[in-house]
């Protein structure tokens, strides 16, 4: 399959070396699918949704006395009342309500036993859970009017994990441990200590010998021994100890001289027993061999030895054998004993050691508890470790242990955990068993012993098979579960405390859904994973929603996360982007999904590969997880393959279990789908990424997310082909929902008419204009289709911010030169030509929102008004009669935006007083000015005003005017749509009638038509509707019926439109819902134009960032031989040490694109006779440089009109795509340089703009894509003379937000001391800071023109003395009288 030349709504020459097999999946599908599964909004059957599952797990709820049961029937979802837009304007949460149907059963009970018999009555009732935030179409949530994103969490998968660590105490001994991690419940650890005792530990509490755990689970000592050890039977004959001859015991070297019954040595110690010899011995009839005494002395019994006389247990299981015991047995005449064979392969003494350790602890317990049964004691021991200091009964201890691991309410492994357990331990317990079983514990311990003996596999906790993703649906499900658990507790408490008759009881008396709502809202508003959406530009939004965080509840803590967790892991390949992660303390903890990766239903990340069989690449594409990838040999996408899909080379570099190895082509199982699959969506936007150092690529992908939307957008000349994909999935670009034809298009609306099985429809796409984002940037959507265009489904019909013809465009193509210029580009600074400022190349608009609310207070209501006490009239000129600033006003700091007065707390005036006041309007004395002022450092134009009034309060003129405007817009929309339907109706009818023959004669105007003839379409279109009815009478009945059917069909469509319109109007008329206590809310939107300034931060896409240091007149900039000056000068020293050479290649290719564009423009200017033919040939020649494209066919078959449109686009620069790891290579560059008539090193001669002299060296000049970042100098610069002071210390506050001062710190004090500037220093530390009296005195002196008096004691001194007094030290300040003065007197 060849790669397409199309990218968005333009052509782009793509240099890919591998064909694009599959589409990049929707970038936001993880979040969308996850939330979809949570609610299942549109589906009929919702019982598989996460929401339903959570509710079913929490019910039924019983009380302890068996009187009541609450059961959950089902739930319905109630659609939201407000649109997203309204919620954002009014500060509400865009959410659904849930109607839960709950049944309360009251039981008849048996009075004696208290058991329930039959239901006395069942009552059903609906309980509402309000405010479950609903995901908007933009994949975000609106909470309290603010758009937020829930970041996906990457956490440790439930299941079992085996680890090894170096011992901290016993030298460098390796200690092994196993952890069983549930999704919910207690963690269980098994670990070795330095003495080889195996311990269990629950929830990081004190450790207990592992045998205690098994005994508490009702295993006898003998069971435990048989589970973990093979046993040997030893016969005692003639004071000798004999054992059956088993060749498998001697698989290694023999540990002792093996003797037969007669004492002959068969195998010498330290020698091997060959299979052949063993066979021979068996044939010779060797059955018993002697077991040496010294070996027997170190063994332990596997079964109890019974005293032959008394019948009592003589020696218990696990008793160590010694001389006296053996003697005793011989004396007793015991014939055989069973011993634990801990010398067998794959065993060790750890369980025996644990038995020895547990004997100690149980012996002490026996004395205190006075219980003999050791299994009960074991349970009590566990209870005491978990709940120290609490009294305990055997029953409580048993049930406690059962609850810990075997109760589905307290413990949940989840299906994923069960799957991982079964996979690791080789069990086949069914998926739905999500609690632990005894089998799990035994097999875990067995595997741990295996690991210690070097046979099992240690797990890597950072392997992506052991980490999984919890997306929004699951996170929200967990929160809901927490809320339900709280509610369950509350319900059970209520059930027990209810006294009196139960007959009156209803479900809502018990169920309080507030707890659920609170838990969910807390998660959305203050949870660690719920973040304020980064909305600087479309890319930052898309990547924010694709982010994976290892932090958050149940995740890591960033202070404790080590290096390993943060590092790139081999399994990240094709799953997680290795480049994009923040710098700083979160590095590596916050990641991004790779472009092609998907997340499966278990939460594991999958990467796509093509299947390879016998060195033959097939068409089968599989998505596999990191675990499934183990032992698979994977070839890179760049592997050479012939046209039949056979791998050409014999030996290729492949990936196998995280290592890169050379392997034969036959060994290969899979091949990468595309080199692009490694990187994430932001890194994939960097051309020539393969030539950049990783650190710089990281900065580049992070800085692209900070690019501000500019006034005019401009797609990159050198892109990567990813631009169209990002805008395809961002909501900012408007995409057609259904196919059709553009009926009307203007700056704010696009109407597309089409027809499907339901009838003719008109899709109306309203466009956002000047919408303020979370980061105060401005989003505007611009239509890119024309009237009459035929639109396909999913086609981009309007560009969002930072988009150009359906491609992402976050910056500008600028001509740059790499050279020093009078020292102005020292330390990465950037020199900019004045032309860029003049042409508004980097001008952006930022919109700020200020709001003010009038509240109801105890002593009256605040009012928004124009008459404000003690304010001059000229300060109110820009306000309207309601006291709100007028639209279009240019506001500056300190201007009043909204006038508001608030009543002073005063005694209630008498009715007479009130009357007088009403007559004379003497209000001023009793109210205080609380107006909204324009803050410092904000100036701009008021672009929008929103006024919301609470129900029952009178709307002011401003609110009424806004309503009228909105209504007028809706009415005109409706009118337009009706006209379109009308037009379509006449077209259809005319088309139909013109094809039918007349049944009678008819006259239209002055022309007569005979029966049997046809009337042409144009004539029918010219007849008005009422006359047409008469004309139709002249056709046959069938035709008349069809005509009526068409009329009715369109009538129905018009009715539908009318209903929709009325619905919209009713929404417009409904009252504003405001938070309680607020009577009126006014929002003012101020737009500021920010031109590029000295101090603004700019960057390229390769991590090459800098600050604008100088804006130079165009005339002084260096210029080329044809007189064109460059636009930006960058420092060449920023390249070699940073190793981001990608920018140099980008500059070369950008120059080629622009030069070729100029050649095409020249063709347009000259317009020869066969101009189109030449243009087509030129475009084919350019596109043919990249081999893997369908350029020839596409361009040669394209219609002339289309070709001209695309040619016009290319005349402003031919667009190239250099995809990640597949950029333009040397031969392609050579061809392109030749086509563009550029010298082969891409450099050119420049002349100094100031002197006109030729530069000595040739300079690298070309086009680079430059971005203006969100760090604008206007928003950072800040100055204060006087302002607020901190309360306790009385020093000026800090920070721009608080209008604070600059801190004169310790080191600054040293500087003044060094200069000996004592007076200035004293002033700095007193009256300029916190000497309250001194400040006031200085102010008085300055106003009177006197000299500033001496300063007093700084407030800090008083604070210090107070703190000393609080410590109990009596510190007082005394003023000393100056002796010098007294002498003068």
Swiss-Prot record:
Keywords: DNA-directed RNA polymerase, Nucleotidyltransferase, Transcription, Transferase. It catalyses: RNA(n) + a ribonucleoside 5'-triphosphate = RNA(n+1) + diphosphate. One of its GO terms (cellular component) is DNA-directed RNA polymerase complex. PROSITE patterns: RNA_POL_BETA. It comes from the Bacteria. Pfam families: RNA_pol_Rpb2_1, RNA_pol_Rpb2_2, RNA_pol_Rpb2_3, RNA_pol_Rpb2_45, RNA_pol_Rpb2_6, RNA_pol_Rpb2_7. Belongs to the RNA polymerase beta chain family. DNA-dependent RNA polymerase catalyzes the transcription of DNA into RNA using the four ribonucleoside triphosphates as substrates. PANTHER family: DNA-DIRECTED RNA POLYMERASE I SUBUNIT 2. GO terms for molecular function: DNA binding; DNA-directed RNA polymerase activity; ribonucleoside binding. GO terms for biological process: DNA-templated transcription. It is an enzyme of class 2 (transferase). The RNAP catalytic core consists of 2 alpha, 1 beta, 1 beta' and 1 omega subunit. When a sigma factor is associated with the core the holoenzyme is formed, which can initiate transcription. Gene3D superfamilies: 2.40.50.100, 2.40.50.150, 3.90.1100.10, 6.10.140.1670, DNA-directed RNA polymerase, beta subunit, external 1 domain, DNA-directed RNA polymerase, subunit 2, domain 6, RNA polymerase alpha subunit dimerisation domain, RNA polymerase Rpb2, domain 2. Its EC number is 2.7.7.6. This is DNA-directed RNA polymerase subunit beta.
């Amino acid at each position: 399959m060849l790669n397409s030349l199309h990218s968005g709504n333009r052509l782009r020459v793509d240099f890919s070396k591998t064909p694009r097999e599959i589409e990049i999946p929707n970038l936001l599908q993880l979040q969308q699918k996850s939330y979809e599964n949570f609610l299942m909004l549109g589906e009929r059957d919702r019982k598989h949704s996460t929401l339903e599952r959570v509710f079913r797990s929490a019910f039924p709820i019983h009380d302890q006395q068996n009187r009541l049961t609450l059961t959950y029937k089902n739930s319905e979802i109630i659609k939201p009342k407000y649109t997203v837009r309204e919620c954002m304007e009014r500060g509400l949460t865009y959410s659904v309500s849930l109607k839960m149907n709950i049944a309360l059963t009251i039981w008849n009970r048996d009075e004696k036993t208290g058991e329930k018999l039959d239901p006395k009555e069942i009552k059903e009732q609906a309980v509402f859970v309000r405010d479950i935030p609903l995901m908007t179409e933009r994949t975000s949530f609106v909470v309290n009017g603010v758009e937020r994103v829930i970041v996906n969490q990457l956490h440790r998968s439930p299941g079992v994990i085996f680890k090894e660590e170096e011992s901290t105490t016993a030298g460098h001994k390796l200690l092994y441990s196993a952890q069983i991690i549930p999704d919910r419940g207690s963690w269980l650890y098994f670990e070795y200590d330095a003495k080889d005792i195996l311990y269990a530990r629950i929830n990081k509490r004190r450790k207990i010998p592992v045998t205690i755990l098994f005994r508490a689970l009702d295993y006898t000592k003998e069971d435990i021994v048989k589970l973990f050890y093979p046993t040997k039977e030893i016969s005692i004959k003639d004071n000798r100890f004999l054992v059956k001859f088993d060749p498998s015991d001697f698989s290694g070297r023999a540990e002792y001289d093996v003797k037969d019954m007669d004492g002959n040595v068969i195998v010498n110690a330290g020698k091997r027993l060959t299979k052949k010899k063993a066979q021979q011995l068996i044939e010779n009839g060797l059955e018993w061999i002697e077991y040496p005494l010294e070996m027997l002395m170190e063994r332990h019994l596997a079964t109890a030895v019974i005293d032959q006389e008394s019948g009592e247990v003589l020696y218990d299981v696990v008793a160590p054998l010694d001389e006296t015991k053996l003697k005793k047995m011989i004396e007793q005449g015991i014939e055989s004993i069973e011993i634990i064979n801990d010398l067998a392969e794959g065993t060790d003494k750890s369980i025996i050691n644990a038995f020895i350790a547990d004997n100690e602890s149980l012996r002490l317990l026996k004395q205190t508890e006075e219980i003999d049964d050791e299994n009960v004691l074991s349970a009590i021991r566990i209870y005491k470790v978990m709940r120290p200091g609490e009294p305990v009964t055997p029953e409580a201890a048993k049930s406690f242990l059962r609850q810990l691991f075997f109760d589905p309410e307290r413990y949940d492994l989840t299906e994923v955990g069960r799957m991982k357990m079964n996979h690791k331990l080789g069990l086949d317990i069914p998926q739905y068993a999500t609690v632990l079983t005894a089998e799990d514990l035994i097999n875990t311990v067995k595997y741990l012993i295996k690991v210690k003996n070097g046979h099992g596999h240690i797990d890597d906790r950072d392997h992506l098979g052991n980490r999984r993703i919890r997306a929004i649906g699951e996170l929200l499900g967990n929160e809901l579960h927490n809320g339900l658990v709280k509610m369950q507790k509350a319900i059970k408490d209520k059930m027990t405390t209810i006294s009196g008759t139960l007959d009156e009881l209803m479900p809502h008396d018990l169920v309080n859904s507030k707890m659920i709502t609170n838990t969910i809202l807390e998660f959305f508003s203050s949870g660690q994973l719920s973040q304020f959406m980064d909305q600087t530009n479309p890319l930052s939004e898309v990547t924010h929603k694709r982010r994976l965080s290892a932090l958050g509840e149940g995740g890591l803590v960033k202070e404790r996360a080590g290096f390993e967790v943060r590092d790139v892991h081999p399994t990240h390949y094709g799953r997680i982007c290795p480049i994009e992660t923040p710098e700083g303390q979160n590095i590596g903890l916050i990641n991004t999904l790779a472009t092609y990766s998907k997340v499966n239903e278990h939460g594991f990340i999958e990467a796509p590969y093509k299947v390879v069989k016998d060195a033959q690449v097939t068409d089968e594409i599989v998505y596999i997880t990191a675990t499934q990838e183990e032992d698979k040999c994977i070839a890179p996408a760049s592997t050479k393959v012939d046209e039949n899909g056979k791998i050409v080379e014999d030996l290729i570099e492949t990936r196998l279990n995280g290592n890169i190895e050379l392997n034969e082509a036959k060994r290969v199982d899979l091949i990468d789908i595309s080199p692009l699959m490694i990187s994430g969506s932001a890194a994939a936007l960097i051309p020539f990424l393969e030539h950049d150092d990783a650190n710089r690529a990281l900065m580049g992908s992070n800085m692209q997310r900070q690019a501000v939307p500019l006034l005019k957008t401009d797609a990159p000349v050198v892109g990567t082909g990813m631009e169209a994909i990002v805008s395809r999935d961002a909501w900012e670009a408007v995409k057609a929902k259904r196919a059709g034809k553009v009926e009307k298009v203007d700056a704010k609306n696009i109407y597309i008419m089409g027809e499907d099985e339901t009838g003719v429809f008109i899709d109306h796409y309203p466009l956002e204009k000047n919408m303020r984002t979370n980061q105060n940037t401005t989003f505007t959507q611009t239509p890119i289709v024309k009237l009459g265009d035929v639109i396909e489904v999913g086609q981009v019909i309007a560009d969002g911010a930072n988009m150009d013809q359906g491609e992402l465009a976050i910056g500008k193509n600028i001509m740059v030169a790499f050279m020093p210029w009078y020292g102005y580009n020292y330390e990465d600074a950037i020199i900019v030509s004045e032309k860029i400022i003049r042409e508004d190349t980097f001008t952006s608009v930022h919109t700020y929102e200020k709001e003010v609310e009038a509240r109801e207070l105890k002593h009256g209501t605040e009012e928004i008004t124009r008459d404000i006490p003690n304010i001059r009239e000229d300060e109110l000129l820009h306000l309207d009669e309601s006291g709100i600033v007028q639209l279009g006003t240019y506001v500056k700091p300190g201007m009043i935006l909204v006038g508001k007065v608030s009543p002073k707390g005063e005694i209630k005036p008498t009715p007479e007083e009130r009357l007088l006041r009403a007559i004379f309007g003497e209000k001023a004395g009793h109210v205080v000015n609380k107006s909204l002022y324009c803050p410092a450092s904000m100036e701009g134009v008021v672009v929008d005003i929103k006024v919301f009034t609470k129900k029952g309060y009178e709307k002011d003129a401003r609110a009424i005017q806004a309503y009228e405007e909105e209504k007028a817009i809706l009415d005109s929309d409706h009118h337009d749509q009706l006209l379109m339907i009308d037009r379509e109706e006449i077209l259809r009818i005319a088309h139909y009638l013109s094809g039918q023959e007349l049944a009678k004669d008819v006259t239209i105007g002055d022309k007569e038509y005979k029966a049997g003839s046809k009337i042409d379409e144009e004539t029918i279109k010219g007849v008005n509707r009422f006359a047409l009815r008469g004309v139709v009478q002249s056709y046959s009945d069938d035709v008349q019926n069809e005509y009526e059917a068409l009329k009715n069909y369109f009538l129905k469509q018009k009715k539908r439109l009318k209903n929709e319109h009325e619905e919209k109007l009713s929404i417009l008329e409904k009252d504003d819902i405001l938070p309680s206590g607020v009577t009126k809310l006014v929002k003012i939107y101020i737009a500021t134009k920010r031109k590029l300034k000295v101090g603004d931060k700019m960057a390229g896409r390769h991590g090459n960032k800098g600050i604008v240091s100088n804006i130079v007149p165009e005339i002084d900039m260096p210029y080329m031989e044809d007189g064109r000056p460059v636009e930006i000068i960058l420092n060449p020293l920023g390249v070699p040490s940073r190793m981001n050479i990608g920018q140099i290649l980008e500059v070369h290719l950008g120059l080629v694109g622009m030069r070729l564009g100029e050649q095409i423009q020249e063709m347009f200017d000259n317009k020869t006779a066969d101009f189109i033919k030449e243009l087509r040939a030129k475009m084919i020649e350019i596109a043919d440089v990249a081999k893997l494209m369908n350029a020839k066919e596409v361009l040669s078959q394209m219609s002339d009109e289309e070709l001209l449109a695309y040619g016009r686009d290319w005349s402003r620069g031919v667009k190239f795509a250099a995809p990640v790891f597949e950029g333009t290579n040397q031969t392609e560059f050579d061809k392109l340089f030749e086509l563009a008539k550029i010298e082969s090193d891409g450099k050119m001669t420049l002349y100094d703009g100031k002197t006109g002299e030729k530069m000595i060296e040739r300079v690298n000049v070309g086009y680079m894509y430059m971005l203006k970042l969100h760090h604008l100098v206007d928003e950072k610069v800040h100055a204060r003379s006087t302002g607020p002071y901190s309360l306790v210390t009385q020093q000026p506050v800090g920070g721009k937000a608080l209008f604070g001062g600059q801190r004169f710190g310790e080191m600054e004090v040293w500087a003044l001391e060094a200069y000996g500037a004592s007076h200035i220093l004293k002033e700095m530390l007193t009256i300029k800071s916190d000497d309250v009296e001194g400040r006031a005195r200085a102010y008085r002196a300055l106003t009177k023109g006197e000299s500033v008096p001496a300063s007093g004691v700084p407030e800090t001194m008083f604070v210090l003395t107070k703190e000393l007094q609080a410590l109990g030290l009596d510190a007082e300040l005394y003023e000393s009288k100056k002796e010098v003065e007294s002498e003068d007197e």
